[in-house]
């Protein structure tokens, strides 16, 4: 068995990355044994052959992640090599620190690993720079089975102009978690469809029930990701910033509208005061008001709902639907992924690399080894395998099930770059604090965004 160790990777940096990084690790993806495509038949036939029938092939596989992810991945590599003894996979792994810079240098110099893990926020910039960095999974349908993924998940994760340059390692997304006991007592229903305006009315009912309670809690980050961005997408039908044109997808009046909505949430006591929440940063579950059930619901992510639930053991929590305005032009909510897996466009062994990734995603033994080290599995067979093991249940799975029902456009690219995120988050936070009118904040925000876009 391969031992857990770091493989040193020495490269000369050809350039530095200007792409927005996101090295968020989650859990995993797994797969099941019920494969139906030609890819399955091809691999099964290949597996019956001996090493003597093939020239030896060595693949490099680069990823980041903690010890649990690393050991599980190494164990899958071992299993694959036992079934395909003519293929050797050299593992190159470590932490996320410096990973993007190393990846950039290797892509530019043509020395990148045959198989590599990719940050979702980085990929649009890489594809724009040179789509040839990546092999298209659609070109290998006889080796890699894409049918086990939901089409909408593939469309929003790793697909560019119809080319599947990456496949998601898991399913994640925005979530709303709520205290079902409190909601039932007050007469609030998050299990049915509702609008942004309905949230305000729900908040008023909470105040009538208990003036010290709030319907919602959220941090400054969620103000942007859970209100500003989806609201604008629903209102305009466009992504916030348009990658193709390098223009805004909204007008100043649209931003004024969403900022006025945020102002209403805080003026009416629908959302807990930002001055109270800000002290807890991203750890909303440590807020005593959450622990003491003074908040009915919280905006968050599928990867954090279990933490929020665990912080209040006396509560009875459920995953709720997400708000969509009447006559929305885009639902604004969508599944995304923690990371992508990619095959190098420069690899001399793309078929074998695809064979390994098909095993990684679509093999029952691999699924049982990987469990959930890269988030909720993105494939139907992977989810079934995890369900059989009893490790895919509860509020995280419920929140993922809900986010999968939405078909909004993934606003990945310019909108999610670090500078833009900071601009939008700051605008929403200013209004939440009452530090500027929606009109004034919108005007200054437009100026900052246009200045940013002019540099692109």
Describe the role of every protein-language-model region.
Residues 203, 245-279, 322:
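Glycine-centered hinge/linker elements that transmit conformational signals in sensory
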Residues 132-134, 138, 303-307, 339-418, ...:
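Mature extracytoplasmic/periplasmic domains
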Residues 106, 113-114, 144-182, 215, ...:
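A structural signal for short loop-to-beta-strand junctions that line the ligand-binding cleft
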Residues 78, 82, 88, 186, ...:
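Extracytoplasmic/periplasmic substrate-recognition and gating elements
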Residues 79-152, 181, 185-187, 288-297, ...:
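Extracytoplasmic "Venus flytrap"/periplasmic binding protein-like
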Residues 55-66, 87-92, 114-115, 165, ...:
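Short, well-ordered beta-strand elements
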Residues 44-46, 50-52, 120-173, 197, ...:
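Hinge/lid segment of periplasmic solute-binding proteins
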Residues 161, 165-169, 174, 200-254, ...:
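Extracytoplasmic/periplasmic solute-binding protein
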């Amino acid at each position: 068995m391969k031992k857990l160790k770091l493989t040193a990777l020495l490269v000369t940096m050809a350039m530095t990355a200007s792409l927005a990084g996101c090295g968020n690790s989650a859990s995993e993806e797994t797969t099941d044994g019920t494969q139906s495509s030609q890819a399955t038949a091809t691999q099964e036939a290949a597996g019956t052959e001996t090493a003597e029938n093939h020239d030896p092939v060595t693949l490099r596989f680069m990823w980041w992640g903690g010890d649990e992810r690393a050991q599980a991945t190494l164990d899958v590599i071992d299993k694959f090599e036992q079934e395909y003894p003519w293929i050797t996979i050299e593992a190159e792994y470590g932490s996320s620190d410096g990973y993007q810079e190393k990846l950039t240098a290797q892509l530019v110099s043509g020395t990148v690993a045959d198989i590599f893990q990719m940050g979702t926020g980085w990929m649009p910039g890489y594809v724009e720079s040179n789509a040839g960095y990546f092999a298209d999974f659609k070109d290998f349908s006889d080796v890699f089975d894409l049918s086990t993924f939901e089409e909408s998940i593939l469309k929003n994760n790793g697909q560019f102009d119809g080319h599947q340059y990456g496949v998601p390692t898991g399913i994640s997304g925005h979530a709303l978690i709520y205290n079902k006991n409190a909601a039932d007592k007050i007469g609030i229903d998050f299990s049915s469809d509702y609008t942004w305006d309905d949230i305000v009315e729900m908040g008023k009912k909470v105040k009538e029930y208990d003036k010290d309670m709030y319907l919602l809690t959220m941090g400054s980050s969620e103000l942007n990701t859970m209100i500003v961005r989806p609201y604008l997408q629903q209102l305009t039908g466009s992504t916030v910033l348009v990658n193709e044109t390098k223009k805004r997808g909204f007008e100043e009046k649209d931003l004024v509208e969403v900022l006025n909505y945020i102002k209403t949430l805080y003026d009416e006591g629908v959302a807990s005061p930002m001055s109270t929440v800000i002290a807890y940063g991203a750890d909303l579950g440590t807020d005593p008001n959450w622990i003491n059930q003074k908040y009915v619901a919280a905006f968050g992510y599928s990867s954090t709902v279990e933490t929020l639930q665990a912080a209040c053991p006396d509560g009875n929590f459920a995953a709720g639907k997400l708000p969509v305005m009447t006559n929305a032009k885009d639902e604004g909510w969508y599944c995304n992924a923690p990371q992508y897996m990619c095959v190098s466009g420069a690899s001399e062994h793309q078929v074998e690399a695809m064979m390994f990734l098909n095993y990684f995603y679509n093999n029952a033994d691999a699924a049982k080894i990987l469990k959930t080290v890269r988030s909720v599995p993105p494939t139907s067979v992977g989810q079934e395998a995890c369900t059989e093991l009893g490790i895919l249940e509860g509020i995280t799975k419920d929140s993922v099930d809900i986010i999968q029902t939405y078909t909004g456009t993934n606003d990945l690219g310019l909108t999610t770059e670090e500078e833009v995120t900071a601009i939008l988050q700051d605008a929403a936070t200013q209004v939440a604090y009452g530090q500027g009118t929606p009109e004034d904040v919108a005007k200054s925000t437009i100026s900052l965004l246009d200045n940013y876009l002019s540099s692109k």
